[in-house]
Amino acid sequence: MSKDTKFQRKKILFIIGSPNQTSQMHQIASQLPDYDCYFSQIYTTHPIGRFILRTGLLENTIFSGEFKRKADSYLEKHRLRNDYARSIYRHRYDMAVLCTDLYVTRELRQIKTVWVQEGMTDPLTSWGKWSRRLGLPSYMAKNTAFNGCSNISDLYCAASEGYKQQFISRGTDAGKVFVTGIPNYDHAAAYLNNAFPHRGYVLAATSDIRETFNTEDRPAFIRDCVKIAGNRQLIFKLHPNENKDRAVSEIRAFAPGAMIYTEGNTEFMIANCEELITQYSTVVYIGIALGKKVHSYFDVEQLKKLAPVQNGGISSASIADLCRRYIEFTGTKEEFLRTTRTATTTISLHERERSDNHYHYSNQEGVFPPAR
């Protein structure tokens, strides 16, 4: 073995998707400076999947469209190496860190894999239950209800003990799941120090329900928001995947006095609000952690049981440590799991400051464009 081969740095491919997933993977990679880290939008190598991708039918999914454009822009801005579909650098990777296990290509299944929970999973529908009974792939549930439940990855990093139990109950081996917390949702107190110019309002954070092939009565939702707000200022923050022109038009029609933000840091807006209204959005967990009164299409009491652990922002370091130990482990996956114990650090919101190596997704970090 040559000297160059002996000391060659190991390579890790981070699979990204939404803005939140992209920034989470960046934070984890930043904790692994001794490895060559590359990034790729989630992709398919199957001929049928590639054909569907070319038709444009996946434009509103994390495979393509605005999600991929934003991810590519983020990678370029932060000078991260983009190896989309392993087609640019063509490396043989030692490990893949996954943002989803709903779809994992065959070649990635042949190497070590670590799955990281992004945030909230979608509700389990009747069709989702039937798809599982029929033995269909998890993505056939047509939402993210089974993300983290395919049992495909070698290791799973969960946001909380509540989510760990959910993943286990839906199919993932208990010994694979580690409660690490998840970046962006592990230190809500950090968002209290912000430059958002408004305070004391009711914030409504929308979801991309219609854009992901589901139905929604948006006018009814807007009217509910107006009723909850009462005499207080109502602010809408639109989901980044929404049809913004349509959403803005609807809000102006049914809540003419509301302010509308299509961009900006949602977490900062939550930190300054009095009350938070959500649909199917993970940001509800920021409101819960900060003690806000929250509304959600999910049962709020159940959400409190699932809420991500608050560990002062060390989730990325904990996940990176797990990756480091696993990639360097020379035994089998089963041997690694037998020798590794789950370690979760949960501390008070105000006890510890977040690491300086924190990367929150925004095209204009800390900058808030005028409300529409």
Description of each model-found segment:
Residues 89-90, 104-110, 167-171, 196, ...:
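Short loop/helix-cap segments at secondary-structure boundaries that form the rim of catalytic
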Residues 13-187, 284:
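Active-site and donor-binding regions of nucleotide-sugar-utilizing enzymes
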Residues 35, 54-61, 109-116, 251-260, ...:
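Active-site regions of enzymes building and remodeling cell-envelope glycoconjugates
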Residues 263-308:
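A donor-sugar binding/catalytic signature common to diverse glycosyltransferases
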Residues 153, 306-372:
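Leloir-type glycosyltransferase catalytic cores
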Residues 7-18, 204:
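Nucleotide-activated donor-dependent transferases that construct or modify glycoconjugates
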Residues 24-25, 31, 183-250:
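Conserved catalytic-core segment of nucleotide-activated headgroup transferases in glycan assembly
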Residues 54-55, 59-65, 229-263:
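Catalytic donor nucleotide-activated moiety binding site of glycosyltransferases and closely related
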